[in-house]
Amino acid sequence: MKQLLSYTLSMIFVFLIFSCNTSEKKKAPQQDEGTQVQSVQNYSIDTSGVSIKWTAYKFTEKLGVSGIFDQFALNLKNDHGSLETLLEDAEMTINTVSVNTGNEIRDPKLRTSFFKIFHTDTIFGKILDTKEGQETLELKMNNILHNVAYTYSLKNDTLFLTTHLDLRQWNGVEALKSLNKECYEVHTGGDGISKLWPDVDVVLKFPIKMNL
C-alpha cells in the first residue's frame, strides 16, 4: 500500500512539472510575435514634395554644377508600407525640357545642345530591386535601357535615393561633346583645359510620413 501511494504521488509530481514547462513554451511564441509586430514600420510618401537634383561636373578638378527638373511624374505601386515596399516597382518619367539650373543662359543650351543631341525628351526610370545590397533601378535615355545601382537612406522625415550615372553607358559622348563645344569657355579651368565629365550624380528626395 505504501509503495502504491508513493508511486501515485510521484506520478502527480511529474505531471505538474510537465504541465508548467508546457505552459511556458506556449507563452514564448506569443511574446516573440508581439515584438515582431511592433518592429514593423508603416510609411507613406508625400508625392507633392518629391524633388530631383542632379550634379554634373566640369573642369579637370571636377567642379560640380547642379540643377533640378521641374516636371516629372511619379507612379507608386504601393502607397504605404516599409521603405522597401514603397520603392518596389516605383516608376518615374522626367520631362527634360523642364531642366532648371537657375541660369537663363545655361538652361536653353542644355535643352538644344545636350538633350536634343542625346535624343532624350523624356527620361524613364523604374525600381527593379529593393533588397539590401541588390538595389537596382532601370533607366532609359537615348532609347537605351541600362540598369544602375542605387542607395537609399532615411534622414529625419525624408527618404534620400542616390545614384551615379556614367552617360557613356547611354551613348552620350556626342551630346557631351556638343554641349562642351557650346560652353567651351565656361568649361575651361585654370589649367586651360575645357572639360565636361560623363559623370552625373542624382539625388531624389521623398518626404516621408510615419503612419500610426
Enumerate the predicted regions with their spans.
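Bacterial N-terminal signal peptides that target proteins for export
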Residues: 1-9
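C-terminal motif of bacterial Sec signal peptides marking the signal peptidase cleavage site
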Residues: 16-19
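Low-complexity, acidic/polar, glycine-enriched regions of mature
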Residues: 21-212
